[in-house]
Amino acid sequence: MAACTAAQQLLLVLSALGLLAAGAPQPPNIVLLLMDDMGWGDLGVNGEPSRETPNLDRMAAEGMLFPSFYSANPLCSPSRAALLTGRLPIRNGFYTTNAHARNAYTPQEIMGGIPNSEHLLPELLKKAGYTNKIVGKWHLGHRPQFHPLKHGFDEWFGSPNCHFGPYDNKAKPNIPVYRDWEMVGRFYEEFPINRKTGEANLTQLYTQEALDFIQTQHARQSPFFLYWAIDATHAPVYASRQFLGTSLRGRYGDAVREIDDSVGKILSLLQNLGISKNTFVFFTSDNGAALISAPNEGGSNGPFLCGKQTTFEGGMREPAIAWWPGHIAAGQVSHQLGSIMDLFTTSLSLAGLKPPSDRVIDGLDLLPTMLKGQMMDRPIFYYRGNTLMAVTLGQYKAHLWTWTNSWEEFTQGTDFCPGQNVSGVTTHTQEEHTELPLIFHLGRDPGERFPLSFHSDEYQDALSRTTQVVQEHQKSLVPGQPQLNVCNQAVMNWAPPGCEKLGKCLTPPESVPEKCFWAH
């Protein structure tokens, strides 16, 4: 039998989901809510004692909670690249080979970005007639060839980099904010952030962008993909005036409360427009909470060890909620091992599209889990740069390498695991365990404090199964061309498109490409 066309595949999916109506089929809208440095333990539904996330808790009560959902990397840029490609960063190029097991991302001086050879989710969704918008942080490269509107998005309001600053526009420029193809200002200038008080109106702007886009696409009767990637919970944390000082958790809690309020507005609009049953919404975060910034500017990873920058559970296990009234039964909890890469494949399935067949796709289609409660065996791989640090299979997690950061950094105050030191586990030298991995049973020991005895039958059984999975993975792995090796002061945001109209072009320094330095 001939392969199904995209249209035939869509008809089959919509028929199975009960979404066919008179006239042409309309695939479900897709809304992905990606937070920045938000921890697993920041949601009331996950046990945060202040219970300051009523809308997210309601979202979970009306949908499906995933307690075992993971990012693809303990850092922002590689995780976002994995979400939009469905592929591990080691495959899509979002890693560095400048040093062993180093986290890398896309600061202003990076020369690399998302390769044209990668197929991004919005590019593929266009084939099914979707209109695509990104709101917030892109972080997959800021040079012209990496612009999100060149990679499938139709609209953009947000920034190419994180909201670090303010800078003097001499040694380093302030980060631009874009409206579609051109900048419309810069952070700390046209888009102020008060570093002393934490006041900024950005979340309100990002929320209104989302609401306006939904209303416009509903009026057009056009299926839409909204990628809402806001960064209020990334240090320096910010919140708007009406939320500052309202949380029991300090400024970080203020930001979480505002995000929760915004999520409530988005879900309410979908319901008021009568399109909630035809809109799939998923909430998660790019990596674990940055404990180094806690408590005032960092979140909670609940019972899990360490945080952002590490491949312990606190660095990569994320809050995750799926919401789709009328399709995902209310009040469900799934212990399926999920990954941020699954959002790529699941979204394609919703649109009636198959993932690309010319490359390895790491993301799974979670619709069978969400709609029918099916469980799938799959490993979770924990990479740090070019190094496979750990793997989880079922309840067992095997550490092939352990490292938090160097003793030098640690003694100078950089601590990714404050108050959580575990002897022989949270090491400050790179320790190899590939012959005899440290293995933990995450069901009994979610904090990774008590490794199984090497001599136990349980260890030997877990080792046998884990070793097979790792060997199969590494045997077939073809790493992508590393994108995060070369830096250059001349490629920073000196003169973004549109700067001429605003009189905000800056003169770049001489181009001097050099190897990026990644400390940890």
UniProtKB/Swiss-Prot annotation:
**Sorted alphabetically, which SUPFAM superfamilies does this protein's record hold?**
Alkaline phosphatase-like
Pfam families of this UniProt entry?
Answer: Sulfatase (PF00884), Sulfatase_C (PF14707)
Task: Report which superkingdom the organism of origin falls in.
Answer: Eukaryota
Gene Ontology process terms (BP): chondroitin sulfate proteoglycan catabolic process
Q: Catalytic domain: where is this region?
A: 24-377
> What cofactors does this protein use?
Ca(2+)
The SS bond pairs are 306-417, 487-516, 499-505
* This protein's GO CC annotations: lysosome
Q: At which residues is 3-oxoalanine (Cys) found? A: 76
Where does the record place the catalytic residues?
Answer: 76 (nucleophile), 139
Keyword Nuclease attributed: no
Q: Which UniProt keywords apply?
A: Calcium, Disulfide bond, Glycoprotein, Hydrolase, Lysosome, Metal-binding, Signal
Asked whether the keyword Metal-binding is assigned, the reply is yes
Tissue expression, as annotated, is: Widely expressed. Higher expression in liver and kidney.
Q: Please give the InterPro entries that the UniProt record associates with this protein.
A: Alkaline_phosphatase_core_sf, GALNS, Sulfatase, Sulfatase_CS, Sulfatase_N
Q: How does it assemble?
A: Homodimer.
PANTHER family found in the cross-reference section: ARYLSULFATASE FAMILY MEMBER, N-ACETYLGALACTOSAMINE-6-SULFATASE
Instruction: Give the family, as the similarity comment puts it.
Output: Belongs to the sulfatase family.
UniProt name for this protein = N-acetylgalactosamine-6-sulfatase
Gene giving rise to this polypeptide: Galns
